[in-house]
Amino acid sequence: MAKKGKKLQDAAKLIDRNSLYSAQEAIELAQKTSTVNFDATVEVAFRLGIDTRKNDQQIRGAVVLPNGTGKTQRVLVFAKGEKLKEAEAAGADYVGDAEYIQKIQQGWFDFDVIVATPDMMGEVGKLGRVLGPKGLMPNPKTGTVTFDVTKAIEEIKAGKVEYRADKAGIIHAPIGKVSFSAAKLVENFLAVFDVVQKAKPAAAKGTYMKSVNITTTMGPAVKIDAANVVVK
């Protein structure tokens, strides 16, 4: 553990904690200071000036990253009739109804995302206590409760990520892997930055984006100069 700690300390020395970096600089530094021996995930964290206790200041949604996440998402679809066949044709990993509800109740979680048609939500809703804490409950805001299962599956497979402000007003979202080129990570970052910026609640007061950091798995945080981020 001491060796890992020294690696992180050495990596952190490359970053000036008092400086704000451009997106390009921050991402390149995050890549350079990744100390783990696997292809780490690169993540962005937004600290927002919102009061999440108020319903009109909740932020939740999804965005398709232009260059994907670098991770293959396993999709479970709850549907009936023709929608079952449509989901299979679109590339869903698991498709069904009651049998998968039972499997989940018994502790099965070999999937990453659930898509459900609206007519299945009465049944899927029974899994709320199990799926909710894991962030797996389908939601219309993230496009995972829909009759257009083909579009939902294609977007997820293409690299759609969900984002949600936690109680402290912080949003975490993956933007790819350390092995990605910096240019691809910047494009993915800008896609997330754009939707979070546009999601500012009308009722939010004061500074909206209080801080924006780039990190890698177990790596140090690099601060981004959010005021000068330009989304083309």
Swiss-Prot record:
Keywords: Repressor, Ribonucleoprotein, Ribosomal protein, RNA-binding, rRNA-binding, Translation regulation, tRNA-binding
Domain of life the protein comes from: Bacteria
One Gene Ontology cellular component annotation held by this UniProt entry: large ribosomal subunit
Gene3D superfamilies reported in the protein's UniProt record: 3.30.190.20, 3.40.50.790
One Gene Ontology biological process: regulation of translation
InterPro entries: Ribosom_uL1_bac-type (IPR005878), Ribosomal_uL1 (IPR002143), Ribosomal_uL1-like (IPR023674), Ribosomal_uL1/biogenesis (IPR028364), Ribosomal_uL1_3-a/b-sand (IPR016095), Ribosomal_uL1_CS (IPR023673)
An example molecular function term from Gene Ontology annotations: structural constituent of ribosome
Subunit annotation: Part of the 50S ribosomal subunit.
PANTHER family according to UniProt: 54S RIBOSOMAL PROTEIN L1, MITOCHONDRIAL, LARGE RIBOSOMAL SUBUNIT PROTEIN UL1M
Family label: Belongs to the universal ribosomal protein uL1 family.
Function: Binds directly to 23S rRNA. The L1 stalk is quite mobile in the ribosome, and is involved in E site tRNA release. Protein L1 is also a translational repressor protein, it controls the translation of the L11 operon by binding to its mRNA.
Name this protein carries in UniProt: Large ribosomal subunit protein uL1
Species this chain originates from: Lysinibacillus sphaericus (strain C3-41)
Gene: rplA
